[in-house]
């Protein structure tokens, strides 16, 4: 290259000369343009994979970024990453599974302890809040923690969430009254909001993309299994020790998890963290505090409206109407704010507008709805129709949970070996919808073979594609957005579950009340029968077999309506899959240090 008065910039060591030659070669190719003379062009700053502007004054430089820029334009590129392996990886995975175990257990373990809790605190009217307080904060803060994971140390954000969760569990364990228990549940939910998504984010930074699906499946399988064994464990603690151990159990498990991660988890520092020279106000604005303040009551309003409407209050009641109107106003405000905040939004709009990511979130939400509806209402069917205890009903749902776990693992292995994640997403709707569709044919005297077989078909289909939305997000987004993309998928799953469980609860309670009102010689009000609980039917009507049979038919029909809701959400999930771009994780590398 000849001197033109800028020889001080062009006479550089060999590596820089090689870099300029490579850029010149790229200029000769259609669609490529580079600027080596610093004439105002910004190309050097925008090349995929580069971290800073390259000039001759920088001395020897690595030519790899330019080579990669010529071959990859859609996805960042992964430098060689020293992922943990062997015993270290095993310990990290076990620690994450223990953390997820606590979160999932806490979601359902309280169910069988509620009767004893209400007896001790004399607070039957607070029953709904024992579960709702946990779910409300878990859903509402899910996206907020996604933002924290993007901006700060993943390891310490996760450990902070675990600490908050443990504090909440401790408050619940020592609660002297119902109000303290509800506060503890809300605090535990706040910590739980960052644990499940955080575990998946840590997996993303600890394993190569092509193997990530199988590890994600293992984490998700633990969540599903724990959700079912929760009531079993809660019943054992309540009967044999005290209900307070439903919460104390989280303390030693969380302690082991924290120690393991402190010593074995090491994620490189990321360049996406806030500038230390920023003012306090600038740092705070990175968290979108206004958006969070709007989003929290928005979620609370819709979940409360669905829980109260048609049961506690009529749909026309002013309180329910006000909640729905307020939800709509807050949602519109939140969405508008996300556009206005740009990159400082809780969820930058460009991420949601990425077709595969947005569609995967809808898919994950609908599948989460199907899963949680069945987790909650299958035990009710066994308790009301078959007279099973809480423990027995949990055992009877094992065919679904085991097959879901197997499906999760099979789906993860398939993606790891083939690289393609969309086939498993397409496999879910037909298999799962046939399974749950057959379950809507259940009658009071359905055979054991049918209720086992139909559960297996539904669970296997659900498991195959249940977590592929998370894989889709991680494969479709640059690693700097992995935390938010993962949190978005987890939020969709949790919120979809919470939303449609409330819808199913409305259908169930209304159908029971309506059906019981048509039963002759009931001897008590339909509401009184409903409030007594599904496990009390044999005690209430056991002396009159024909009346008991009639009441069980009413409960069977009501539960079937919840199964139909799961059938609808399962079928609708195929519409979301259509918009997910087919892709492979094979050979798709991600630059981990840039996150």
Curated annotation (Swiss-Prot):
The keyword Transport applies. Keywords: Cell membrane, Glycoprotein, Membrane, Transmembrane, Transmembrane helix, Transport, Virulence. It is a multi-pass membrane protein. Its main location: membrane. The chain crosses the membrane at residues 91-111, 126-146, 156-176, 186-206, 217-237, 245-265, 290-310, 320-340, 362-382, 409-429, 451-471, 483-503, 559-579. This is MFS-type transporter phomT. It comes from Diaporthe leptostromiformis (Lupinosis disease fungus). MFS-type transporter; part of the gene cluster that mediates the biosynthesis of the phomopsins, a group of hexapeptide mycotoxins which infects lupins and causes lupinosis disease in livestock. PhomT is likely to be involved in the cellular export of phomopsins. Residues 1-11 have a biased composition (Basic and acidic residues). SUPFAM superfamilies: MFS general substrate transporter. One of its GO terms (cellular component) is plasma membrane. Belongs to the major facilitator superfamily. TCR/Tet family. Residues 30-48 have a biased composition (Polar residues). The gene is phomT. Glycans are attached at residues 39, 44, 177, 277. Pfam families: MFS_1. It is found in: Cell membrane. Residues 1-62 are annotated as: Disordered. It comes from the Eukaryota. GO terms for molecular function: transmembrane transporter activity.
